[in-house]
Amino acid sequence: YPRAEILVVNDGSDDETASRAEESGATVISHPVSLGNGAAVKSGARAASGDVLVMMDGDGQHKADDIQSLVDKLAEGYNMAIGARDSGSHAGVGRLAANGLYNVFASMISGHRIPDLTSGFRAVRADLFKKFLYLLPNGFSYPTNITMAFLRSGYPVTFIPIKADKRTGKSHIRPIRDGLRFMAIIFKIATLYAPLKVFLPISGLFFISGISYYAYTFFTMGRFTNMSMLILSASVIIFLIG
């Protein structure tokens, strides 16, 4: 890609990342300390001058040969094209299962099928991406936020099947801690973009529980209990929150 502007964001690495990238002809943007994956992406997006942004992780798992298929989708009218990894490209069964859970929940919230919510390999129209920079966190969850933001804003998004190589280097993600944080992030996004899809089922569950408990106490004790009223009141409050 001789006409491409290649930017490498060095997020506080103290190895030879920056010097080797510069020797290869890339423009290097260096953070004095590690600010996070999302912060690195935002720095690169602000510095980029092109109409199309292509983002790849720096761990060697994404293939440059797949870039053209992503960019071609933008020419077809999509605003973002994402490389969706196959099942063999995930680091272990646990990571595959966790990502599958995220994908199902995000698909339910967005109303669109999302085969790979956490993929960092994507092509996107620069002007639209930059409009959402203020929403993106500095941490690893930027792919989730930008994908959900585009889908809920009505911008066409597509997914292209890719096969990712095994990553090089050590992952800093802790499955349990970061998995819980990730679910919390998806929940926050859901409450921002589609609150009723979260709160309506919860409200319905409380309502059914309250009615069922009322029926049980009425037929067994012949009276309406305070607990039934409390559960039904909780149902109404949760619905109003949504």
Sequence positions of predicted segments:
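Short, non-helical or kinked segments that cap or interrupt transmembrane helices
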Residues: 63-67, 116, 175, 224
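Hydrophobic helical membrane-anchoring modules
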Residues: 136-242
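A recurrent flexible, glycine/aromatic-enriched loop bordering the glycosyltransferase active site
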Residues: 86-93, 107-121, 139, 167-169
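Low-complexity, intrinsically disordered, cysteine-poor segments enriched in small/polar
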Residues: 96-100, 104, 108, 175-186
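Short, basic, helix/turn surface patches
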Residues: 58-64, 108-113, 185-197
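Structured catalytic core of nucleotide-sugar glycosyltransferases
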Residues: 1-100, 108, 123-134, 145-152, ...
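Short, flexible coil/turn micro-motifs enriched in small/turn-prone residues
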Residues: 7, 31-33, 39, 72, ...
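Short glycine/serine/threonine-biased micro-segments
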Residues: 10, 34-36, 48, 75, ...
